């Protein structure tokens, strides 16, 4: 957690449809595995306690009771787990049934986030069982009445609502909000509100089925949302074990940060992916972007959670040359773009001043070579002859035969005029004028 890095994970455990006890054991197994990696934010799929494909079994009291009991069991078993954990289950509230993400921390249920957008098109018919959440004030509800006694730490009322931001007490920039599956696919996802109200990480508990080509679209959604909101985005989806009666789930898990995909699972394999999200960098980037809205302190409810601060061992990698793509095709495309941008700028300037020629100092090194290539492209776009480009090479003490020959060949191949002005004697005269010994290669010499 130090220096802004938060160790995070997205997990897809094997699920047994409608067997909450078995699913709870798989969830706990995954939690203990993530504990070994010192993960501070753990995200599981939508309906991971029951399975997504329970269909009308969701309307059965026995399944709902079993899911609730298993949530309490998972909470009780994770009292010593130093992390914020998100799991999915069905939850009864005010006579309706909701698809919720439950947030757990040190054995406590710290919040319920209901799904806002309930799909009822194509292969989805969730409205048959579930109600969509309203964007309204967060309620504090005594869900545990009659389940725990008054001396038990569970006795606190639990916040229920879409507009919850979970804020780490030890590290205020570690702020998390949740949305569920379809919420990301709509024109205005809840994560927009969450981000502009201070959430640096969005978690998505999902059960997204597989269709040909859907994985790339899903990836674009996740990376694009993380870029647009300048946030970390953790996407955990259902996988093997769900019913394949009419759908197949591939368990495509992703962790993205500000448009970059930090980690992605192999589809059709259950498991866990890990990475580190730099929330301090995200906060800095938001401050730099003058059009990013100021954080509102009144529209969302802040819910505190606690994790210990410790060193984070980095598994994510940073490129040695961040501005130079390692893939040749991408590198060629980037170089082409650089040339076009600079050539367009030069073309506009030359047309504005009605210039018919240009002069460039050509040493044979990288900088002057790029300048000449840009100039050639600008002249070609203006339909002007390259002979009007005047290259001047000025060999001196530091000029090697290689760079000198490069300058000569480059101008010749590109059809530009070349003039050589040897400046050795002029520099020696200047050294004598200022009283500097030309054998002393210090700052003055350079």
Report residues per predicted region:
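ATP-dependent adenylate-handling ligase core
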Residues: 384, 394-446
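Conserved hydrophobic/aromatic pocket- or pore-lining residues that grip, position, or stack substrates
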Residues: 342, 365, 395
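Enzyme catalytic cores with a strong preference for nitrogen-chemistry domains
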Residues: 1-361, 372-373, 377-388, 402, ...
